[in-house]
Design a protein with these regions (language model features):
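Amphipathic alpha-helical repeat scaffolds of TPR domains
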Residues: 2-28, 51-74, 98-114, 140-152
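Alpha-helical repeat scaffolds
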Residues: 34-49, 75-94, 118-132, 157-160
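Acidic, proline/glycine-rich low-complexity IDRs
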Residues: 129-160
Length: 160
C-alpha cells in the first residue's frame, strides 16, 4: 500500500473515531477531544495536496478529507474552500468509480455537504443491489450514516 493511501485510510479511521467519540457511552475527556481534533486537522491539511491518478486511491483521499474536515472543530479560515476543492475532485471521479462500498461512502459524504438529490439516488441505487442478508458491518454503518444525513440535514436550509 502506498504512502498517500495509507495516510488517507489512517485519516478516515481517526476522523471516524472523532465523529463517534462518546457514542459508545464512554465519557468524553477534553484532552482526548482536543488531541483528536488537532490530529484530524493536521492530518487533513497535510493530505490536502495529495492527489492520485488511481481512481480508487483518489476516492479514498477525497473521502478522508471530507471526513476529516467535517469532524474537526478547527478552521484557519480556509476549511470551506478546501472542502469545495475536495468536492470538485470527487465529482471528477464519481462517474468513473465502480459501484462499491467506497463509492457509496464518497456519495454519502458529498451528499452531506451539498444535499444534491442525484448523489442520494446514486447511493441508494448501489445499496439496493447489496445482498441484504449478507451485509458487512461497514455496509450497515454506511447505510446508517446515509440515513442519518438524510433525516438530519443540518445546517441545510431551503432558501425562498
Amino acid at each position: 500500500m502506498n504512502s498517500s493511501l495509507s495516510c488517507a485510510l489512517e485519516l478516515q479511521h481517526v476522523a471516524h473515531e472523532l465523529m463517534y467519540l462518546g457514542m459508545d457511552g464512554e465519557p468524553i475527556y477534553s484532552d482526548t477531544f482536543c488531541r483528536l481534533n488537532k490530529d484530524v486537522f493536521v492530518k487533513s491539511n497535510s493530505l490536502f495536496s495529495s492527489k492520485s491518478s488511481d481512481i480508487e486511491e483518489e476516492a479514498n483521499l477525497c473521502l478522508a478529507l471530507l471526513m476529516g474536515y467535517n469532524a474537526t472543530i478547527y478552521d484557519y479560515g480556509d476549511k470551506e474552500q478546501k472542502k469545495q476543492s475536495v468536492l470538485d475532485r470527487a465529482y471528477n471521479i464519481l462517474e468513473q468509480l465502480p459501484a462499491s462500498l467506497l463509492k457509496v461512502r464518497l456519495l454519502t459524504y458529498c451528499y452531506g455537504e451539498i444535499y444534491e438529490e442525484s448523489l442520494l439516488q446514486d447511493a441508494h441505487f448501489i445499496i439496493d443491489q447489496w445482498d441484504k442478508g449478507a451485509l458487512t458491518s461497514e455496509q450497515m454503518e454506511t447505510m446508517e450514516e446515509l440515513k442519518n444525513i438524510e433525516e438530519n440535514q443540518y445546517p441545510f436550509e431551503v432558501l425562498q
